[in-house]
């Protein structure tokens, strides 16, 4: 007796189709699982056996073999419990074999209740691409999986409910897609921030062009507060960005029935004690790290010099390529990691260097040693560096309302729309000025004669690298877009240069 049931698996953040074959034959009773199963898959034997018996079926006292194809890919996790049960029951003749347009995923309890699994959305998308029309998943995963187009997703609470549906005795209603508007609510507002207009301006430029930014200032000046409000002025995520981001968070086990879709740009703020593997991703079965969880969003590193140097160096390649590769003996996995890097730091170890109160007792060598923890190549990849002054009492008590995130976002959205139209006309794939490919840089960043002269003088005086020069051009292009200027003028160049004048050698 033979049965074939379709299921799915996940490698990295991508799903793939799995064919589960169940074969019951004469011989000594036994239950073997083949096809590179890990320990969790092998343990499914006991869960499936108990679930079958506890739901009124007789477990076959025969020789049973379950094959998970393709056999050259390692199968991990508990998601094969449900398809294994369906395969055994159909091979034993207790239920009719499901059609080729059905797929099953889910972990079983001993009583036959379904428990959620990770990676529901990437598996649902893989099912849709494989031509599967109906996907049966645990009820807690249904809203997430229903975000995939062209697929009927059925929420299953337990084995009895599923068997009744397959026998057409009591049908399960397909899950509706999640409410995206509700998912995106609840981001803090810039209206809460008093003063610090120069920092708000720098963050507006960073948001408009997708630029990396470093905020330097004393404790309590509002660095973290403003950084956490940055997502509120970033452009809304497209559907494709939501899918990409949710896939990563789903594989990491960070989605939930209450919040199945990542509809607002993520903000990840790892502690400075994070390891290199925690930042980049890793594990025996590779899982995404903080830089991938920040994909399409913001990676906020507070107290930047306190991070270990080997951890900070992990950032260099993802900042250039927008992806990170994790290599293991079992294979290589690539995770997307296109994020905005937002960093904050004190001007010195004590936090009060240069403060008007005179509380700092650091020597010049102490300050230089503190700054030297950040490597030149990493600083070269930061587009804007802005100083946050200590907040004056009059500013703190000012009753005039501060500009809201919604008002700032309107200008950011307008600048991004200019960029999208420009890249579409030029045949480029970039989404914002920070990602302008080198081949398009000179064409896109047309500088006026006065601006070119200023840039030349700054290049010589500041001893800029080629990368720094390119990044100043990109920032100037964003400033010009915010001003709705076709060409980059000298004032745009001057403001862009201003954000690279913080001296890490003399401070």
Label the predicted regions.
Residues 296, 302-303, 314:
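Walker B catalytic acidic pair
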Residues 167-205, 209, 236-291:
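P-loop NTPase nucleotide-binding/switch module
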Residues 18-24, 279, 383-386:
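Short beta-strand elements
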Residues 40-45, 60, 67-77, 285-286, ...:
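Basic, amphipathic alpha-helical bundle interface domains used for macromolecular binding and assembly
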Residues 1-214, 218-224, 327, 468-469, ...:
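Peripheral, non-AAA+ core regions of ATP-driven protein-machinery
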Residues 215, 301, 344:
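Hydrophobic anchor at the beta1->P-loop junction of P-loop NTPases
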Residues 214-256, 321:
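Walker A/P-loop
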